[in-house]
Regions:
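Active-site core segment of subtilase-fold serine proteases
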Residues: 145-147, 159-201, 350-435, 532-545
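Catalytic-core segments of hydrolase enzymes
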Residues: 253-356, 401-521, 587-588
Length: 715
């Protein structure tokens, strides 16, 4: 596997307790998210759209909602009988496309437990600029394996596919068109209407792109079957699309990996949402989800506070950037830590202007579109959500001028505590900043507890952090740039930190190469001309010109891990999420960059360390050997070889009757020989190069059905 895509490191983990779905009706007596109240009451609601703009939804609008249910078939049938679209995702979740006016009618269904408000996710490409991180593997070193992901389905749910890029030629078994549904088709779409920067093209090539003549920038699982799904990145779309990928793979008897290089800052960050729980239910033996952690490692989008006095509120200053966000739009959520379904906190959005505090009345809050509060039925935690143009709040409170500060005001009993998050990605420049205005003070936020919502927070998703495969790149014009991601080999400065709130689930689980990565570019993207400086290679293929370039992000680290897991699944198709975590825990490469880890070899920045393709494969084969099946295959591709400058490690891919490992000099003289009797899959032998004088040798592996010879250079 002599690829320019650097694969080095590994992962693993502890068991993850499943969250039993708990949905109750509390004091309001309603069975829908409080954010839907305005629509139910005949008013408008603000939502985030796929292009990061704020969109107004009216009671007459059609919306997509996920519905927690007791009887999925009965609820689906009732919705369809009313003339609307519905699809069963799991036995506990139905996705429905309904007019907002139908919410109350749907809630009357006895098998409906709770109607969730729509959520919007976004791509997790590093915001500063695209970077490339492809490191050339030194000649004579690297990983040589017959495992290519053959027979494994890799589903990429993303935005920005150049479908005709030769990296995907002959590899795509199904497409998902630009829709909010999960329908797959054999027909290639004419274009991806959601292609702004070619994100999906870059991602899919890292995971599994083919080698194109004239380019060295190809993927990891080059034999895998691809399903390319262009998604609107709403929760309902992702749920339906993930189910379709799973259904296709399982119908064809194939293991599968779903790559999710997207997420959101807003949510409880505890894996409790209906979306997280039901996406986890789709996973199982031979079915793995891999998700990007996020790119907020440098930002102050999170805050944790504890009430220290019954009489003194805590303030959080939600700063906006006038250069990027002149309308002062704020999207923020606050979540209490108590899980007893009680409202311990009094939470209000307020304004400080000069030295005066403007505090809304309860009536003003009730009428404030974009503000909602309540008890979440999935985790029993109190929450408050704010999504509005802050000028609206200023108008209601009769605040003049534009230099005012919008704050959360939180009161409670001593010892009460909460987490808060602010979206500074879709609304660039927003963050929690320190403030001191008269008697009103606020401390700055931090970058902790930033596991990406909607993908990485899924209980059974492998959450991936990013380290730097390189720190510089040279473009087509020969100009060399510093990518601005930090030191080569270190954690990418943008990589989001864990942990998950209130859970022992390891998030992240592992780090993959995501800083300065070179991969396929989409020439069809809306921003293609703006990315000319980051193009590193162009090739001519079948009468067309195609491009490769540099991007950075946990979006790029994630498909590297997805591709490696596909190799492991080819070797052992019965691997589960728990098996993958065990592999990562046992084989994660923890060098000096990774630093201090806990008793489980984990920390909140790196997870279990850098992913290690070879040692992970060894562990996967060992697990296969422990399955109780002991068939001797005498295969034609018996070994995987990890070639390093000081040793060659030989790993048996299957059970063999025997093997001989021999080293000859260029005169044909036998220098070293080892006979291995009945090696089992996962058996390893090490050839120590320190035992040989500098020079060129021939390394020969012989089994019943094969004989393989490789050149070995000792320096």
């Amino acid at each position: 596997m002599d690829k320019k895509l650097l694969i080095a490191g590994a992962i693993a983990l502890m068991s993850v307790p499943s969250l039993a779905q708990q949905v109750k009706v509390y004091d309001t007596g309603t069975k829908w998210d409080a954010r839907l109240n305005h629509l139910v009451e005949g008013r408008t609601m603000q939502v985030l759209s796929a292009n990061k703009s704020t969109q107004t939804v009216t009671p007459q609008s059609n919306i997509s909602v996920s519905v927690s249910v007791n009887d999925a078939a009965a609820v689906e049938a009732a919705i369809k009988a009313a003339g609307y679209e519905a699809e069963i995702i799991t036995d506990e979740l139905v996705v429905a496309h309904i007019p907002a006016s139908y919410i109350t009618t749907l809630a009357e269904q006895p098998n409906v437990l709770f109607i969730n408000a729509p959520r919007q996710f976004h791509k997790l490409m590093h915001n500063v600029r695209p970077e490339t991180g492809v490191t050339k593997v030194t000649a004579g070193e690297g990983l040589e394996t017959p495992f290519t992901g053959k027979g494994v389905v890799i589903g990429v749910i993303d935005q920005g596919f150049e479908y005709k890029h030769p990296a995907f030629k002959g590899r795509v078994v199904r497409y998902g068109a630009n829709s909010g549904g999960g329908m797959l088709t054999e027909r290639m779409p004419t274009s991806d209407r959601l292609d702004d920067v070619g994100h999906a093209t870059h991602v899919a090539n890292i995971a599994a792109g083919s080698k194109v003549e004239g380019s060295d920038y190809y993927g990891i699982a080059t034999g895998a079957d691809l399903i390319l799904v262009s998604s609107k990145f709403t929760d309902t779309a992702v749920e339906a699309q993930a189910k379709s990928i799973k259904d296709y793979a399982e119908k064809n008897g194939q293991p599968w990996v779903i790559n999710m290089s997207f997420g959101s800052i807003i949510g409880p960050h505890d894996g409790s949402t209906s979306h997280d729980q039901n996406m986890s239910k789709l996973c199982g033996e031979g079915g793995i989800m891999v998700a990007a952690m996020g790119n907020e490692g440098n930002d102050k989008f999170h805050a944790y506070r504890e009430i220290t006095s019954d009489s003194e509120p805590v303030y959080l200053y939600m700063k906006t950037d006038n250069n990027y966000n002149p309308n002062k739009i704020i999207l923020s959520e606050l979540w209490g830590t108590a899980t007893d379904a009680q409202a311990h906190l009094t939470i209000k959005p307020c304004i400080i202007n000069g030295s005066r505090l403007y505090e809304p009345t309860d009536e003003q809050l009730d009428n404030l579109s974009g503000f909602s509060t309540g008890i979440d039925p999935y985790n029993n935690r109190q929450y408050a959500r704010l999504h509005l143009n802050s000028q609206v709040l200023a108008s209601i409170l009769k605040v003049t001028g534009t230099s005012y500060k919008v704050v959360w005001q939180v009161s409670g009993k001593q010892g009460d505590s909460f987490h808060a998050w602010i979206d500074g990605s879709n609304y660039y420049g927003n963050n929690f900043m320190a403030m001191s205005v008269g008697k009103y003070k606020a401390h700055s936020g931090d970058a902790e507890y930033m596991v990406g919502e909607g993908a990485a927070t899924i209980g059974k998703a492998i959450a991936v952090a990013s380290y730097n495969a390189a720190s510089r790149f040279t473009n087509l014009n020969g100009s060399t740039y510093d990518a601005g991601v930090g030191e080569t080999g270190d954690i990418s400065n943008f990589s989001s930190h864990g942990p998950l709130v209130g859970e022992a689930t390891p998030k992240p689980a592992v780090a993959g190469p995501g800083g300065t990565v070179l991969s396929a570019f989409s020439k069809n993207s809306a921003q293609f001309e703006n990315y000319r400086s980051y193009q590193v290679q162009k090739v001519n293929s079948e009468g067309g010109t195609y491009y490769y370039g540099m991007m950075s992000g946990t979006s790029m680290a994630t498909p590297a891990v997805s591709g490696i897991i596909a190799l492991w699944l080819e070797a052992n198709p019965k691997l589960t999420y728990e098996n993958i975590l065990d592999i990562m825990k046992a084989t994660g490469r923890r060098d000096n960059h990774v630093g201090k880890v806990d008793a489980n070899n984990w920390n909140a920045t790196w997870g279990f360390g850098k992913i290690d393709a070879y040692n992970g494969l060894k562990k996967a084969l060992e697990m296969k050997g422990q399955s109780g099946i002991d068939e001797t295959l005498n295969s034609e591709a018996p070994v995987t070889i990890s070639k390093n400058h000081n040793e060659w490690r030989v790993l048996f891919n299957n059970n063999e009757s025997f093997a001989t490992l021999q080293v000859f000099n260029t005169n044909g003289q036998l220098v070293s020989s080892e006979y291995v009797d009945a090696p089992r899959c996962g058996t390893e032998r090490v050839v120590n190069l320190a035992n040989f004088a500098p020079g060129v040798y021939l390394f020969k592996v012989s089994t019943t059905a094969s004989s393989t010879t490789r050149k070995l250079v000792v320096k």
